[in-house]
């Protein structure tokens, strides 16, 4: 079984449900056994910087090296420092990373 982490920010449930359904459905069509771990922060929803910092701290909880791959979406992240922090973190792991909406050398 392949373990995939999906990291996203600020999406509401209908959009993310479609992503999970698409990833899992596509995996099944390809005959792949995938377990998807979804981490969705909401650091863009508040004017309270401490709240936002706490939300983004959730991204530090998973050991990303324990996954077979990571899907990274920061299209709703408005804090450039947070995007750059996550990019550096993802560049330091030894698994493939697919980046949605943000071009990073070395990511797919």
Indicate residue ranges for each PLM-predicted region.
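Alpha-helical recognition/docking segments in bacterial nutrient-uptake
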Residues: 1-108
């Amino acid at each position: 079984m392949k373990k995939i982490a999906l990291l996203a920010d600020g999406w509401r449930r209908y959009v993310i449900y479609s992503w999970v359904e698409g990833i899992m459905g596509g995996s099944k069509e390809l005959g792949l056994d995938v377990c998807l771990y979804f981490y969705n922060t909401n650091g863009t929803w508040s004017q309270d910087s401490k709240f936002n910092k706490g939300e983004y701290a959730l991204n530090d909880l998973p050991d990303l090296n324990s996954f077979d791959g990571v899907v990274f979406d920061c299209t709703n992240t408005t804090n450039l420092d947070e995007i750059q922090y996550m990019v550096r973190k993802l560049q330091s792991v030894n698994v493939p990373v697919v980046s949605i909406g943000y071009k990073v050398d070395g990511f797919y």
